[in-house]
């Protein structure tokens, strides 16, 4: 019985083996086809990769261009709000001017448009806007400022200090020169002038001398806020005249200065007067210098003013 079972099993295996072989051959054929198809699909994917990459780059470029166009359109809309363009063609001409300028100056068109908006809002005449924008854009590039920042800074100088456009451009050149030759960055110095330039000019300084004195205070390591406070305190003290306190007047008399005469001298030769006062302080014994400075200009300005006594050369930049 067992022998019969074995032979029966072997016979059954023989009967099944043929069909199974055919099935296996068919499966191998399918597997080969699938492998070939997979290989072909892989090759196709490899071939299409550069195309997909190029398409992605193109879509990104189109998206970026669209974004820039929208930013420019928005910026020019702001210009139209503050500048009275009499005709649409006049507005389009300004658009072209801005685009041309963006091709010559490394600043985006919407940044230049922001400068024009700031200038228009501050009262720069329409016929002067293009020149103002070009000068401010160049300043912005040199000072590492955005169009918004450059436009506001230059507009604030002009309006606050009552400067002509040539004076504004000359001031920008002076700030650039000072920042290249002293320990004072152009943005920080520009901010100091924005804060207290008008006050310092009333005290007798020209716009470029305001910049020089501001740079001298900054070079001692003062922040723009501290330097601006020191500049305001220093210059207004020298022109107080009869409004000077008794203790202040006594401190100046100990240096050989009359409060009323000093106020007059500031209007004639502010830079020379400032230099004489600081030189007189520097000539005093060191143990007296800080008490005199505190009495004359106040505690909050010491950090910016005191270092000048050791480096008077900063005042002649």
Model-flagged regions — what are they?
Residues 2-7, 11-170, 179-190, 201-208, ...:
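A short, structural motif
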Residues 212-317:
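Extended alpha-helical or coil "stalk/linker/tether" regions that are enriched in polar/charged
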């Amino acid at each position: 019985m067992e022998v019969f079972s074995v032979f029966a099993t072997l016979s059954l295996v023989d009967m099944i083996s043929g069909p199974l072989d055919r099935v296996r051959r068919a499966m191998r054929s399918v597997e080969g086809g699938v492998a070939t198809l997979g290989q072909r699909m892989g090759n196709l994917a490899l071939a299409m990769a550069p195309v997909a990459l190029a398409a992605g780059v193109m879509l990104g470029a189109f998206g970026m261009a669209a974004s820039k166009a929208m930013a420019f359109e928005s910026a020019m809309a702001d210009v139209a709000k503050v500048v009275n363009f009499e005709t649409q063609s006049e507005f389009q001409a300004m658009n072209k001017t801005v685009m041309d300028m963006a091709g010559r100056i490394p600043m985006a068109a919407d940044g230049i448009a922001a400068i024009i908006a700031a200038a228009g809002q501050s009262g720069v005449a329409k016929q002067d806007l293009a020149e103002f924008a070009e000068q401010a854009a160049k300043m912005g590039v040199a000072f590492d400022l955005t169009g918004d920042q450059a436009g506001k800074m230059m507009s604030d100088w002009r309006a606050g200090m009552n400067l002509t456009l040539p004076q504004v451009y000359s001031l920008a050149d002076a700030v650039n020169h000072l920042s290249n030759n002293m320990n004072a960055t152009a943005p920080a110095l520009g901010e100091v002038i924005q804060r207290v330039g008008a006050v310092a000019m009333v005290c007798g300084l020209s716009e470029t001398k305001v910049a020089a004195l501001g740079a001298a205070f900054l070079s001692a390591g003062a922040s723009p806020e501290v330097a601006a406070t020191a500049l305001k305190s220093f210059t207004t003290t020298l022109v107080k005249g009869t409004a000077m306190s008794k203790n202040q007047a006594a401190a100046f008399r100990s240096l050989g200065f009359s409060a009323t005469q000093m106020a007059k001298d500031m209007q004639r030769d502010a830079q020379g007067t400032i230099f004489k006062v600081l030189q007189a302080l520097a000539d005093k014994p060191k143990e007296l210098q800080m008490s005199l400075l505190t009495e004359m200009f106040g505690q909050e300005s010491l950090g910016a003013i005191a270092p000048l006594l050791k480096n008077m050369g900063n005042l002649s930049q």
